[in-house]
């Protein structure tokens, strides 16, 4: 995958329009000859109107999904696949060698890392075993013996996008939500400034940049207002997490709280482009360019922290209008 030719396929592209636009901008800026393709379950995915070609594919968990992607890769001479949702990361990691067999790279971390990230119990165990501060999770026995203090946080250990995450204030709420939320995990409630951290890592674990973003406001688990912060305590803590992870590749998104006393406590790992990545890119952290370069064989030797701090993003909705016959 050398030279200035590259075709990229974004899977489960959905509403990630700005990310698609940013990659197309880099293509134009550096003279990449190629196309940006998208694939999604729906023909009405907004990204379909901004990519060069859109493909309707089965659900990620349906038989035939991988075969359909392989067909697209062969017909469109795809060089790189970038999966964009949590639910397909393990599947893509498990099939990365199949794609490599036809000359296609998949921007996905190791199977082991994706299993850690996909199950919040495994995420918690990873943090604890590596002495990385994280909110305490209570065992069933501790809950039974009432060895906790309110408020608590309850969430499904296999959930995503903050679905089912609920603050618990008393025993009545705890009893209700234990029954209401399947696969519930109960942990101490942590307050403070909440950050998302975008980290770029090459195929050999070398870090290019780390960008903390303060989450000012969220909607459906995705940041709607945020600001970049050159907080080197958070940057150093994030580097510790990345170095402990098994074979991280590409954009790794971490989440943490910074408490009033300055302690940084991590809560989540998402080994993919996060929804708020356009803020980091706009600040000067060129994730699209670095993605292209690493897939062309570049190894990250020097870190790049030449991005703007205190850049604020205020997101809003735009609409596409069409006639569907």
Question: Where are these predicted regions, by residue range?
Answer:
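Protein kinase-like catalytic core scaffold
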Residues: 152, 206-209, 263-268
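Short, charged, surface-exposed secondary-structure boundary motifs
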Residues: 48, 64-67, 115-119, 164-165, ...
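ATP-binding N-terminal substructure of ATP-dependent carboxylate-amine bond-forming enzymes
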Residues: 1-107
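ATP-dependent carboxylate/phosphate-activation module, predominantly the ATP-grasp catalytic core
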Residues: 187-247, 251, 258, 270-296
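Peripheral (often C-terminal) accessory segments that flank ATP-dependent C-N-forming ligase machineries
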Residues: 259, 290-325
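Active-site nucleotide/adenylate-binding loops and adjacent lid/helix of ATP-dependent enzymes
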Residues: 111-193, 203-206, 232, 236
């Amino acid at each position: 995958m050398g030279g200035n030719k590259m075709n990229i396929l974004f899977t489960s592209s959905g509403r990630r329009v700005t990310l698609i636009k940013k990659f197309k901008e880099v293509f134009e800026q550096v003279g990449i000859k190629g196309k940006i393709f998208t694939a999604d379950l729906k023909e009405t995915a907004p990204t379909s109107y901004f990519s060069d070609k859109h493909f309707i594919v089965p659900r990620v968990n349906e038989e035939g999904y991988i075969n359909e992607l392989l067909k697209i890769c062969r017909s469109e001479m795809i060089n790189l696949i970038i999966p964009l949702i949590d639910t397909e990361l393990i599947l893509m990691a498990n099939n990365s060698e199949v794609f490599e067999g036809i000359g296609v790279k998949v921007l996905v971390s190791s199977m082991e890392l994706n299993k850690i990230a996909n199950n919040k119990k495994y995420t918690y165990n990873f943090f604890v075993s590596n002495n990385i501060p994280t909110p305490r999770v209570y065992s069933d026995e501790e809950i039974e013996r009432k060895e906790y203090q309110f408020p608590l946080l309850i969430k499904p250990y296999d959930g995503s996008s903050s679905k089912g995450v609920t603050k618990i204030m008393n025993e009545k709420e705890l009893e209700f939500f234990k029954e209401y939320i399947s696969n519930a995990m109960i942990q101490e409630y942590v307050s403070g400034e909440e950050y998302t951290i975008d980290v770029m890592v090459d195929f050999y674990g070398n870090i290019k940049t780390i960008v903390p973003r303060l989450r000012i406001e969220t909607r459906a688990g995705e940041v709607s207002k945020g600001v970049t912060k050159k907080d080197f305590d958070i940057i150093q803590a994030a580097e510790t997490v990345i170095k402990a992870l098994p074979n991280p590749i590409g954009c790794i998104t971490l989440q943490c709280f910074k408490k009033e006393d300055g302690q940084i406590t991590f809560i989540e790992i998402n080994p993919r482009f996060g929804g708020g990545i356009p803020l980091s890119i706009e600040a000067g952290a060129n994730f699209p360019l670095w993605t292209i370069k690493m897939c062309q064989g570049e190894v990250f030797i020097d870190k790049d922290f030449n991005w703007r701090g205190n850049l604020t993003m205020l997101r809003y909705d735009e609409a596409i209008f069409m006639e569907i016959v």
